[in-house]
Amino acid sequence: MAHEITDEFVASLHASSDSARAVARNAVAHAGVEPVAFDRAKVVATPTVVSHKVDDWKVTSQKKSGRCWLFSSLNLLRSTARTHLGLKDFEFSQNYVLFWDKFERANFFLTDVIATAKTEDLDGRLLQFLLGDVLSDGGQWDMAVSLYLKHGLVPKVAMPETESSGHTAPMNGRLKVVLRRTALELRSLVEAGASEEEIREVKEAALADVWRILVICLGEPPASFEWEWRDDKGEFHRDGVLTPREFYERYVDVDLTQYVCLVDDPRAEHPKGHTLTVDHMGNVVGGRPILYVNTPVEQIREITASILASGRAVWFGADCGQQSDRASGLFVEGLYDFDNLFGVDFSTSKEQRVNTGESAMNHAMLFTGVDIDEEGNARRFRVENSWGEEPGEKGFFTMDAAWFDANVFEVAVHVDDLPAELRAVVTEEPLHLPAWDPMGALA
């Protein structure tokens, strides 16, 4: 059914203008949409203090990069390492794990290209998705765990930030050219019946180019380093020469193999209480598979609050673009009253937003506090972001419970923190979602 826009219809729209609309039009023309829709009463009604606070450290900054998943997971690990080291503001090297993520992900991509060469058309949806998304900065909790378990960690002083680690786009652009060109070459070799050795030679030549680019942009990752430091009390310590794996094993007392991700996939066709995975998502060949336990968001909120009340931080993924304000550091449902500004009903369910591409998890952060009232209800959460100290309360944000339910999609928790019914499904065969599914959006 096709209907043109008629002059009569346009004339009726002109005739429907009123004085209230004129006021809104003038205000938006002068200040923009969000400042006019901003509900200051929500700010006043949202204190930033919480009853249970884990953090007493400074925030970090991912700068102009998409490394939120690495920063937030490292911030979780440093919350324990800092205690062992006696350094309140200790940081692991985010640049070190970025290097290994890019290198491992290049190998993961090329391996995928070879595996799909005979079954997937170049102009098919899967190959076009893989080629379009090659070597993005984003990632998932399980991908971070794969990196840390294989390559260990180093302190920031052992591999500090560079211009390219904080502004990855130019480096990524060069890497994509190498990988996309090699993908075509590898597909041609497979289709022509080339030997495994011939295919490996082309792949390893491309990986050598990737390594060269990464070393120039990020520096060479240390195979070992001498670790010595002065703690916050002024006492000097020397641990001698350590490998990254040894450093990780000595100072990270979190068993990452026992963590599982709970997600709120609101789509009716994906039942709660079952596991999910996203095909072709990962970074380390042979690494930890992506695994989610689909869980009602109310239960995710309760589990998160319980962990925070016990004094432990929680990694999570959310859609940070919804009803949020960077300057005041607020994630508050209804922070912007777009309905009254425009006279339009913008209400949609979480399921509708996911199904239409309106919402997906796009940013990972760390919960570091919760406010629990006298009845035991979690009213708001304290969030450590990785955007530096300028936003919010020196980089920390405040989230209300309604925003949590509407926009938080994922948390990573220890299996011991799960109720028995969720622990029981962790080992079941997951439902496989396609590579382009919204549940893979953070990566």
Please state what every model-predicted region is.
Residues 2-57:
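N-terminal regions that are enriched for targeting/export leaders
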Residues 14-20, 45, 265-269, 329-333:
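Short acidic/polar alpha-helix capping motifs at helix-coil junctions
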Residues 43-314, 391-394, 401:
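Active-site nucleophile-adjacent alpha helix/oxyanion-hole segment immediately C-terminal to the catalytic cysteine
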Residues 53-57, 350-352, 384:
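Short helix/strand-bridging catalytic loops that position acidic/His residues to coordinate divalent metals
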Residues 68, 148, 355-388:
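Catalytic nucleophile-His microenvironment captured as a short glycine-rich beta-strand/loop
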Residues 71, 316-319, 368:
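Short His-Asn-centered micro-motif
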Residues 287-362:
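Long, positively charged binding patches that form subdomain-scale interaction surfaces
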Residues 373-443:
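Conserved catalytic-core surface of thiol
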